């Protein structure tokens, strides 16, 4: 596959277990997401190890800081050679624009820069608790519009928001969707969920899937089934 849609979320606290899983799957069938836990435990060397094995990596560290600090972190991700990196859109337009600008020298080799809108675990009551009175969907659209204006390539959003965002922000604006569970999977701690085929039909470009693949006895088979359902 030239542009695999599935991004497998690696959530391991043991390096040997993570690499044992990775060695069961084919880099042409998916990409890999490295988040805060694994990056804190194993650092950039783990990402390099995945690159050596032929995988594209989404570095999911959700940077959120003053523009200068955030942009330098994004530059460090570009130096590491990752395929995608993200920042919190709630950091504001100046922070996002600085992060996008610092990637200019990398040209076509630069990572995709993605904004994080509303975490998929958050519901209206959670937003109200931090003083945001808008409905989740309205707040997502506001933050995603800000991200597009700042020059970002796309946003992380739930599948429920995908069609709305494509409609408002255009086909080229990439939508990365977590909270994806193949039919029959456990819901876990993601509140707003959909199956892979439903999410792609709704406008998602990339699907983040974790435990249904990483905890499967035969992850390569599960990946094949998911990819087949997207054709």
From Swiss-Prot:
Alphabetized GO MF terms: orotidine-5'-phosphate decarboxylase activity
Listed InterPro entries? Aldolase_TIM, OMPdecase, OMPdecase_AS, OMPdecase_bac, OMPdeCOase_dom, RibuloseP-bd_barrel
Question: Which UniProt keyword terms apply here?
Answer: Decarboxylase, Lyase, Pyrimidine biosynthesis
**Involved pathway(s):** Pyrimidine metabolism; UMP biosynthesis via de novo pathway; UMP from orotate: step 2/2
* One cellular component (GO) term of this entry: cytosol
Output one GO BP term: 'de novo' pyrimidine nucleobase biosynthetic process
Which reaction is the catalytic activity of this chain?
A: orotidine 5'-phosphate + H(+) = UMP + CO2
**Superkingdom per UniProt:** Bacteria
Group of enzyme by EC: lyase
The UniProt entry annotates the active site at 62
- Quaternary data: Homodimer.
Function comment: Catalyzes the decarboxylation of orotidine 5'-monophosphate (OMP) to uridine 5'-monophosphate (UMP).
Question: What family name appears in the similarity comment?
Answer: Belongs to the OMP decarboxylase family. Type 1 subfamily.
Q: What is this protein called?
A: Orotidine 5'-phosphate decarboxylase
Q: Which organism is it from?
A: Vibrio cholerae serotype O1 (strain ATCC 39541 / Classical Ogawa 395 / O395)
Lineage, opening ranks = Bacteria, Pseudomonadati, Pseudomonadota, Gammaproteobacteria, Vibrionales
| Primary gene name | pyrF
